[in-house]
Every structure is written in structure tokens, then in C-alpha cells.
């Protein structure tokens, strides 16, 4: 097996959309039912995707809102971003659009690996954002999209595998686009 690659992924979104629950479900395989606002946590996990082992460093950020100022650390050495909203919250869906815009401004690149996640899909009766709305938003960003339920462990692993694939796809395109110049 090839040597493992290190990848750093930031998880961003409005408060109480399930960023920490999704991350803990992926890393530890358990659902934390209580809500304790996150300041910032970092988790690590080894995962194999398409035969390649990855050492993931996951930055679980504090909830942002439309007025949040992004710390510069959110753009340094980050290989991909998971943007999470709750399918039960119009506010979180609107704020994720603002977060995306701020992220593009901060990173300064047109194409960055982004995975849009509609979380809490198990709460059928409270749903206010349709699957189609989430998918359309992701397509407008040229981003990957999944809905998830951290509580029922639906697609948690898929979310993190997919962002790795998105990061590798963009890294591959960037390295193919590089030109070499020789001065003689």
C-alpha cells in the first residue's frame, strides 16, 4: 500500500446544525445527543479511500453566522471544506451561502474542494429544505452534495470519503495544469 497522505479538512456551518455530531459519528462511531457549543476541536482518523490511506485532521469549528469573521487559520493548509446546514433550518441554509462567499474571498481561489451537507435528514416532519434545493445549491458552487443524519449514522463516512475525493480531484487538476519553465 502506498504511504499514507495527510489531509486537513475544516467543517463549517451555522450553530447547532450538527457539525460536531457528524464529525464524532465519523471518528468515534457514536452520536452525542446533548448540545454543547463548540469553540473549536480537532480530531484525527485514518481512513482508506480507493486503496490509499489518509491521515485526516478534522477541524470542527465553532458555529458561524452571517457576521462571523473567519480566522485566517481556516485558509492555511486546509485541503477541503465540509459546509453543513440543517435540513430543518432555513436560517442555516441562508447562512451557509454567506459562509461559502466568505470562504472563497478568504482562500482566494476559484476552485476549492467543497462538500455541502444537509444534516438532520432523519427529522422528516421538521424538514424545510428539500433535497433538490440542497443539490441545486451545491451544483451552483460546483461542489459535491450529500444529505446525512449523524444521529442515525446515515452517510457520515461517505461525507468524509467524498471530500477526500473532491480534494484529490482538484489537486490532480492543479498538478496537471502546472507548467514548468526553464530559463537558459
From Swiss-Prot:
Q: Please list the residues that bind GTP.
A: 16-21, 32-33, 35, 37-38, 63, 119-120, 122, 150
Please give the Gene Ontology molecular function terms for this protein. GDP binding; GTP binding; GTPase activity; magnesium ion binding; protein kinase activator activity; protein kinase binding; protein serine/threonine kinase activator activity
Query: Which residues in this protein are found as Cysteine methyl ester?
Result: 181
Is Nucleotide-binding among this UniProt entry's keywords?
A: yes
> Which residues does this entry mark as bearing Phosphoserine?
130
User: Which EC number(s) does UniProt give?
Assistant: 3.6.5.-
**Consequence when changing residue 130 to A:** Abolishes phosphorylation by MAPKAPK5 and impairs GTP-binding
Q: What do the Gene Ontology cellular component annotations say?
A: cytosol; endomembrane system; endoplasmic reticulum membrane; Golgi membrane; lysosomal membrane; postsynaptic density; spliceosomal complex; synapse
Please give the superkingdom of this protein's source.
Eukaryota
Q: What PROSITE patterns does its record include?
A: RAS
For the site labelled Important for autoinhibition of GTPase activity, the residues are 35
Similarity comment text for this entry: Belongs to the small GTPase superfamily. Rheb family.
Q: Note on file?
A: The conserved catalytic Gln-64 found in other Ras-like GTPases seems not to be involved in GTP hydrolysis in RHEB.
Protein name listed in UniProt:
GTP-binding protein Rheb
| Lineage of source species | Eukaryota, Metazoa, Chordata, Craniata, Vertebrata
Amino acid at each position: 500500500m502506498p504511504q499514507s497522505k495527510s489531509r486537513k479538512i475544516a467543517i463549517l456551518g451555522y450553530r447547532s446544525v450538527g457539525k460536531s455530531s457528524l464529525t464524532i459519528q465519523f471518528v468515534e462511531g457514536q452520536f452525542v445527543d446533548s448540545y454543547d457549543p463548540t469553540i473549536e476541536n480537532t480530531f484525527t482518523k485514518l481512513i482508506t479511500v480507493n486503496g490509499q490511506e489518509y491521515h485526516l485532521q478534522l477541524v470542527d469549528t465553532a458555529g458561524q453566522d452571517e457576521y462571523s469573521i473567519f480566522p485566517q487559520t481556516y485558509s492555511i493548509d486546509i485541503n477541503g471544506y465540509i459546509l453543513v446546514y440543517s435540513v430543518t433550518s432555513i436560517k442555516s441554509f441562508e447562512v451557509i451561502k454567506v459562509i461559502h462567499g466568505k470562504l472563497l474571498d478568504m482562500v482566494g481561489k476559484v476552485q476549492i474542494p467543497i462538500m455541502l451537507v444537509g444534516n438532520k435528514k432523519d427529522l422528516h416532519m421538521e424538514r424545510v429544505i428539500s433535497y433538490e434545493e440542497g443539490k441545486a445549491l451545491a451544483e451552483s458552487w460546483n461542489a459535491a452534495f450529500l444529505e446525512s443524519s449523524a444521529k442515525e449514522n446515515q452517510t457520515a463516512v461517505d461525507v468524509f470519503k467524498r471530500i477526500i475525493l473532491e480534494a484529490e480531484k482538484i489537486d490532480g487538476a492543479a498538478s496537471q495544469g502546472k507548467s514548468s519553465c526553464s530559463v537558459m
